[in-house]
């Protein structure tokens, strides 16, 4: 859905605290209650959303600060594919546990970023 309401509690009776209007923004699920999920967004805001409004497709966001360099291969000094500005949202294609690099896609660009340079994947998490 293009609009997702963040509520203060796990029920439609609770007031809406925020309405997200950004598709594929990554969130962290921190609690569950029936058909509701308590989430944390990249800004640290927490609240409840209905589970059917969340997708299992994994995404990332470039946090505030400097541009991130998307590399052709998972190594420092590999050819630059693109520069991703803070706020860019993309798709996590693959992250292997114990590997500092993740294969990602942002728009038409595919390449590799260090997991520490993005928000949306835990330090030792595997994403396939």
For each of these PLM feature ranges, what is it?
Residues 10-12, 19, 26-34, 40-75, ...:
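Boundary regions of SH3-family modules and the immediately adjacent low-complexity/disordered segments
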């Amino acid at each position: 859905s293009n609009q997702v309401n963040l509520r203060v509690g796990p029920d439609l009776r609770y007031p809406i605290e925020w309405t997200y209007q950004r598709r594929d923004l990554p969130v962290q699920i921190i609690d569950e209650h029936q058909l509701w999920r308590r989430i944390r967004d990249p800004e640290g805001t927490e609240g409840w959303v209905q589970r059917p409004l969340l997708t299992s497709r994994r995404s990332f966001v470039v946090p505030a600060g400097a541009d991130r360099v998307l590399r052709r291969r998972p190594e420092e000094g590999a050819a630059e594919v693109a520069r991703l500005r803070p706020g860019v949202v993309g798709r996590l294609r693959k992250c292997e546990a114990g590997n500092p690099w993740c294969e990602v896609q942002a728009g038409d660009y595919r390449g590799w970023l260090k997991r520490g340079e993005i928000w949306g994947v835990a330090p030792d998490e595997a994403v396939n």
